[in-house]
Regions:
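Conserved HGGG/HGGXW glycine-rich cap/lid loop of the alpha/beta-hydrolase fold
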Residues: 7-63
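Conserved alpha/beta-hydrolase "nucleophile elbow" surrounding the catalytic nucleophile
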Residues: 29-31, 89, 93-95, 239
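Conserved acidic catalytic loop of the alpha/beta-hydrolase fold
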Residues: 72-89
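Conserved hydrolase catalytic core segment
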Residues: 87-126
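Conserved alpha/beta-hydrolase catalytic His-Asp/Glu region
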Residues: 132-230
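Short beta-strand/loop motif that positions the catalytic acidic residue
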Residues: 230, 236-238, 242
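Conserved alpha/beta-hydrolase "acid-adjacent" motif
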Residues: 243-249
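Catalytic histidine-centered segment of alpha/beta-hydrolase-like enzymes
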Residues: 268-281
Length: 292
Protein backbone atom coordinates (compact mmCIF):
# COMPACT_ATOMS: atom_id res chain seq x y z
CA UNK A 1 0.00 0.00 0.00
CA UNK A 2 1.15 3.51 -0.80
CA UNK A 3 0.38 6.25 1.70
CA UNK A 4 0.75 9.99 1.14
CA UNK A 5 1.86 11.87 4.24
CA UNK A 6 3.14 15.36 4.99
CA UNK A 7 6.66 13.95 5.00
CA UNK A 8 6.41 12.09 1.67
CA UNK A 9 4.86 9.04 0.03
CA UNK A 10 5.49 5.80 1.90
CA UNK A 11 5.21 2.21 0.81
CA UNK A 12 3.76 0.03 3.58
CA UNK A 13 4.41 -3.64 2.93
CA UNK A 14 1.75 -6.21 3.89
CA UNK A 15 -0.67 -3.62 5.26
CA UNK A 16 -3.54 -4.83 3.06
CA UNK A 17 -3.40 -8.29 4.64
CA UNK A 18 -3.71 -7.11 8.27
CA UNK A 19 -6.08 -9.13 10.45
CA UNK A 20 -7.24 -7.26 13.56
CA UNK A 21 -7.43 -10.57 15.47
CA UNK A 22 -3.71 -11.26 15.04
CA UNK A 23 -0.57 -9.71 16.49
CA UNK A 24 1.18 -6.92 14.56
CA UNK A 25 4.94 -6.93 13.97
CA UNK A 26 6.54 -3.83 12.44
CA UNK A 27 10.03 -4.44 11.08
CA UNK A 28 12.61 -1.74 10.27
CA UNK A 29 15.46 -2.98 8.04
CA UNK A 30 19.14 -2.17 8.35
CA UNK A 31 21.20 0.34 6.38
CA UNK A 32 20.55 0.37 2.65
CA UNK A 33 17.79 -2.23 2.82
CA UNK A 34 14.00 -2.20 2.49
CA UNK A 35 10.75 -4.16 2.88
CA UNK A 36 12.10 -7.18 0.99
CA UNK A 37 13.77 -8.32 4.22
CA UNK A 38 10.39 -8.47 5.97
CA UNK A 39 9.32 -11.37 3.78
CA UNK A 40 12.19 -13.41 5.24
CA UNK A 41 10.74 -13.00 8.74
CA UNK A 42 7.70 -15.19 9.35
CA UNK A 43 6.50 -15.79 12.91
CA UNK A 44 3.66 -18.27 13.50
CA UNK A 45 0.89 -17.25 11.02
CA UNK A 46 -1.81 -18.52 13.40
CA UNK A 47 -0.82 -15.82 15.89
CA UNK A 48 0.92 -13.11 13.88
CA UNK A 49 0.08 -11.11 10.78
CA UNK A 50 2.52 -11.01 7.91
CA UNK A 51 5.33 -8.72 9.02
CA UNK A 52 4.70 -5.04 8.27
CA UNK A 53 7.52 -2.91 6.92
CA UNK A 54 7.45 0.79 6.05
CA UNK A 55 10.11 1.70 3.51
CA UNK A 56 12.21 4.64 4.68
CA UNK A 57 12.49 7.65 2.34
CA UNK A 58 14.46 6.74 -0.78
CA UNK A 59 14.46 3.06 0.18
CA UNK A 60 12.47 0.41 -1.67
CA UNK A 61 9.25 1.94 -2.99
CA UNK A 62 9.05 5.06 -0.80
CA UNK A 63 9.83 8.32 -2.55
CA UNK A 64 13.08 10.15 -1.69
CA UNK A 65 12.91 13.11 0.69
CA UNK A 66 15.46 15.27 2.48
CA UNK A 67 15.48 12.86 5.46
CA UNK A 68 19.05 11.87 6.31
CA UNK A 69 19.04 11.21 10.06
CA UNK A 70 17.75 8.52 12.41
CA UNK A 71 15.42 11.09 13.98
CA UNK A 72 13.94 12.01 10.58
CA UNK A 73 13.54 8.35 9.63
CA UNK A 74 11.71 7.70 12.91
CA UNK A 75 9.50 10.74 12.33
CA UNK A 76 8.59 9.42 8.88
CA UNK A 77 7.51 6.05 10.28
CA UNK A 78 5.71 7.70 13.20
CA UNK A 79 3.61 9.76 10.78
CA UNK A 80 2.68 6.60 8.89
CA UNK A 81 1.68 4.76 12.07
CA UNK A 82 -0.61 7.64 13.01
CA UNK A 83 -2.19 7.68 9.54
CA UNK A 84 -2.94 3.96 9.45
CA UNK A 85 -3.99 4.00 13.12
CA UNK A 86 -2.38 0.87 14.53
CA UNK A 87 -1.17 0.14 18.06
CA UNK A 88 -0.18 -2.82 20.22
CA UNK A 89 2.80 -3.26 17.92
CA UNK A 90 5.77 -5.58 18.33
CA UNK A 91 8.55 -3.30 17.06
CA UNK A 92 11.60 -4.94 15.55
CA UNK A 93 14.71 -3.35 14.05
CA UNK A 94 17.86 -4.77 12.46
CA UNK A 95 21.18 -2.90 12.82
CA UNK A 96 20.42 0.71 11.76
CA UNK A 97 16.73 -0.19 11.93
CA UNK A 98 17.29 -0.87 15.62
CA UNK A 99 18.38 2.74 16.13
CA UNK A 100 15.23 3.93 14.36
CA UNK A 101 13.21 1.60 16.59
CA UNK A 102 14.87 3.06 19.70
CA UNK A 103 13.94 6.58 18.62
CA UNK A 104 10.36 5.51 17.89
CA UNK A 105 9.95 3.64 21.17
CA UNK A 106 11.29 6.57 23.19
CA UNK A 107 8.94 9.04 21.49
CA UNK A 108 5.71 7.05 22.01
CA UNK A 109 6.17 3.91 24.09
CA UNK A 110 2.41 3.33 24.48
CA UNK A 111 2.16 2.19 20.85
CA UNK A 112 4.47 -0.78 21.33
CA UNK A 113 3.95 -4.05 23.18
CA UNK A 114 7.60 -4.99 22.81
CA UNK A 115 10.82 -3.78 21.22
CA UNK A 116 13.35 -6.19 19.70
CA UNK A 117 16.70 -4.97 18.38
CA UNK A 118 18.78 -7.55 16.58
CA UNK A 119 22.45 -7.08 15.76
CA UNK A 120 22.11 -3.43 16.67
CA UNK A 121 24.83 -1.59 18.57
CA UNK A 122 24.44 1.81 20.20
CA UNK A 123 26.34 4.03 19.76
CA UNK A 124 26.94 2.59 16.31
CA UNK A 125 30.41 3.43 15.03
CA UNK A 126 31.15 2.91 11.34
CA UNK A 127 34.76 2.42 10.25
CA UNK A 128 36.31 4.75 7.68
CA UNK A 129 36.76 1.90 5.18
CA UNK A 130 33.04 1.17 5.21
CA UNK A 131 32.07 4.85 5.12
CA UNK A 132 34.33 5.45 2.12
CA UNK A 133 33.17 2.27 0.39
CA UNK A 134 29.50 3.04 0.84
CA UNK A 135 29.93 6.42 -0.87
CA UNK A 136 32.28 5.34 -3.68
CA UNK A 137 31.68 1.66 -4.42
CA UNK A 138 28.49 0.06 -3.17
CA UNK A 139 29.58 -3.41 -4.20
CA UNK A 140 32.82 -2.95 -2.25
CA UNK A 141 30.83 -1.93 0.83
CA UNK A 142 28.61 -4.98 0.40
CA UNK A 143 31.77 -7.11 0.23
CA UNK A 144 32.93 -5.67 3.56
CA UNK A 145 29.56 -6.26 5.22
CA UNK A 146 29.35 -9.85 4.00
CA UNK A 147 32.98 -10.62 4.87
CA UNK A 148 32.46 -9.75 8.53
CA UNK A 149 28.70 -10.19 8.79
CA UNK A 150 28.19 -13.66 7.30
CA UNK A 151 29.11 -16.81 9.22
CA UNK A 152 27.40 -19.38 7.04
CA UNK A 153 25.77 -19.39 3.65
CA UNK A 154 22.18 -20.53 3.26
CA UNK A 155 21.57 -23.89 1.68
CA UNK A 156 20.78 -23.23 -1.96
CA UNK A 157 20.82 -25.31 -5.11
CA UNK A 158 24.14 -24.95 -6.88
CA UNK A 159 23.69 -23.04 -10.18
CA UNK A 160 23.87 -25.31 -13.20
CA UNK A 161 24.86 -22.51 -15.55
CA UNK A 162 27.91 -20.27 -15.58
CA UNK A 163 28.71 -17.59 -13.03
CA UNK A 164 26.44 -14.58 -13.28
CA UNK A 165 23.28 -16.54 -13.98
CA UNK A 166 20.31 -16.74 -11.58
CA UNK A 167 18.21 -14.47 -13.78
CA UNK A 168 20.00 -11.23 -13.03
CA UNK A 169 22.30 -8.82 -14.85
CA UNK A 170 23.68 -7.46 -11.58
CA UNK A 171 26.96 -9.27 -12.30
CA UNK A 172 28.75 -9.97 -15.58
CA UNK A 173 32.08 -11.75 -15.93
CA UNK A 174 34.52 -10.22 -18.41
CA UNK A 175 38.20 -11.13 -18.81
CA UNK A 176 38.39 -12.74 -15.39
CA UNK A 177 36.80 -9.81 -13.57
CA UNK A 178 33.30 -9.43 -12.25
CA UNK A 179 31.56 -6.28 -13.42
CA UNK A 180 28.76 -4.82 -11.29
CA UNK A 181 26.92 -1.49 -11.61
CA UNK A 182 29.26 -0.10 -8.96
CA UNK A 183 32.71 -1.20 -10.11
CA UNK A 184 34.78 -4.24 -11.04
CA UNK A 185 36.70 -6.76 -8.97
CA UNK A 186 38.39 -10.12 -9.13
CA UNK A 187 36.55 -12.94 -7.42
CA UNK A 188 38.48 -15.86 -5.92
CA UNK A 189 35.38 -17.82 -4.94
CA UNK A 190 32.65 -17.48 -7.60
CA UNK A 191 30.39 -19.99 -5.82
CA UNK A 192 30.39 -17.83 -2.69
CA UNK A 193 29.73 -14.72 -4.76
CA UNK A 194 26.72 -16.35 -6.41
CA UNK A 195 25.46 -17.60 -3.04
CA UNK A 196 25.66 -14.06 -1.65
CA UNK A 197 23.70 -12.57 -4.53
CA UNK A 198 20.39 -12.91 -2.70
CA UNK A 199 21.71 -10.75 0.12
CA UNK A 200 23.72 -8.25 -1.91
CA UNK A 201 20.79 -7.39 -4.15
CA UNK A 202 18.95 -6.09 -1.06
CA UNK A 203 21.38 -3.15 -1.06
CA UNK A 204 20.22 -2.08 -4.54
CA UNK A 205 18.21 1.14 -4.24
CA UNK A 206 17.11 3.88 -6.61
CA UNK A 207 20.11 5.97 -5.54
CA UNK A 208 23.63 4.66 -4.99
CA UNK A 209 23.96 7.14 -2.12
CA UNK A 210 21.39 5.50 0.17
CA UNK A 211 23.82 3.18 1.98
CA UNK A 212 26.26 6.05 2.53
CA UNK A 213 23.49 8.30 3.89
CA UNK A 214 22.39 5.53 6.24
CA UNK A 215 25.92 4.84 7.49
CA UNK A 216 26.43 8.51 8.30
CA UNK A 217 23.04 8.63 10.04
CA UNK A 218 24.18 5.77 12.28
CA UNK A 219 27.46 7.50 13.09
CA UNK A 220 25.75 10.75 14.04
CA UNK A 221 22.89 9.34 16.13
CA UNK A 222 22.81 9.95 19.87
CA UNK A 223 20.01 9.77 22.47
CA UNK A 224 19.65 11.39 25.88
CA UNK A 225 20.23 8.94 28.71
CA UNK A 226 16.75 9.66 30.08
CA UNK A 227 15.17 8.75 26.73
CA UNK A 228 17.11 5.49 26.59
CA UNK A 229 15.94 4.49 30.06
CA UNK A 230 12.33 5.35 29.16
CA UNK A 231 12.08 2.51 26.63
CA UNK A 232 10.06 -0.39 28.01
CA UNK A 233 10.04 -4.12 27.21
CA UNK A 234 13.28 -3.98 25.26
CA UNK A 235 15.11 -7.06 24.02
CA UNK A 236 18.59 -7.26 22.51
CA UNK A 237 19.26 -10.12 20.09
CA UNK A 238 22.73 -10.80 18.70
CA UNK A 239 24.15 -13.37 16.33
CA UNK A 240 26.91 -15.07 18.30
CA UNK A 241 29.21 -15.04 15.23
CA UNK A 242 28.62 -11.39 14.27
CA UNK A 243 31.92 -9.55 13.73
CA UNK A 244 30.21 -6.27 12.88
CA UNK A 245 29.17 -5.65 16.49
CA UNK A 246 31.21 -5.71 19.68
CA UNK A 247 30.08 -7.90 22.57
CA UNK A 248 31.63 -5.40 24.98
CA UNK A 249 29.63 -2.56 23.40
CA UNK A 250 26.46 -4.66 23.57
CA UNK A 251 27.01 -5.13 27.31
CA UNK A 252 27.47 -1.36 27.69
CA UNK A 253 24.30 -0.80 25.68
CA UNK A 254 22.30 -3.11 27.94
CA UNK A 255 23.56 -1.18 30.97
CA UNK A 256 22.31 2.06 29.40
CA UNK A 257 18.77 0.67 29.16
CA UNK A 258 18.76 -0.35 32.79
CA UNK A 259 16.54 -3.34 32.11
CA UNK A 260 16.90 -5.21 28.84
CA UNK A 261 16.77 -8.88 27.95
CA UNK A 262 19.66 -10.37 25.97
CA UNK A 263 19.30 -13.37 23.65
CA UNK A 264 22.06 -14.90 21.54
CA UNK A 265 21.30 -16.56 18.23
CA UNK A 266 23.50 -19.60 17.66
CA UNK A 267 25.38 -20.21 14.43
CA UNK A 268 24.55 -16.93 12.71
CA UNK A 269 26.18 -13.54 12.35
CA UNK A 270 24.84 -10.13 11.25
CA UNK A 271 22.29 -11.24 8.66
CA UNK A 272 20.35 -14.14 10.25
CA UNK A 273 17.34 -13.60 7.95
CA UNK A 274 19.68 -14.63 5.11
CA UNK A 275 21.94 -17.15 6.87
CA UNK A 276 19.27 -19.11 8.74
CA UNK A 277 15.78 -17.54 8.95
CA UNK A 278 14.53 -20.36 11.20
CA UNK A 279 16.93 -19.30 13.96
CA UNK A 280 15.81 -15.67 13.74
CA UNK A 281 12.11 -16.52 13.56
CA UNK A 282 12.33 -18.84 16.57
CA UNK A 283 14.13 -16.20 18.64
CA UNK A 284 11.75 -13.40 17.68
CA UNK A 285 8.71 -15.56 18.43
CA UNK A 286 10.08 -16.28 21.90
CA UNK A 287 10.41 -12.54 22.49
CA UNK A 288 7.02 -11.56 21.09
CA UNK A 289 5.16 -14.34 22.92
CA UNK A 290 6.43 -12.98 26.24
CA UNK A 291 4.31 -9.85 25.72
CA UNK A 292 1.08 -11.35 24.36
Amino acid sequence: MFLKTDSGTAYIHNFDSLDSEKEIVLFIPGAGMDHRVADLISPNPKIFNKVLSIDLPGHGSSTPTEAKSIQEYAGFISNCIKEIDISGIHLCGHSMGGLVAMELAASDSKLFKSVALFNCQYPLFVGSALLDGSSRNLDGAADFLTKYGIHKLPKIEKPKKTFGSMGSSFYKKTDGKVISPYGSKEVRDPDREVALFGLKKLFNQVSKDILSIDMNACMNYRMDDSDIKSINNINILIGEMDKLVSEKKIDEMISMFGSAQLKKMEGVAHFPFFEDPKVLNKTLEEVFNTYI
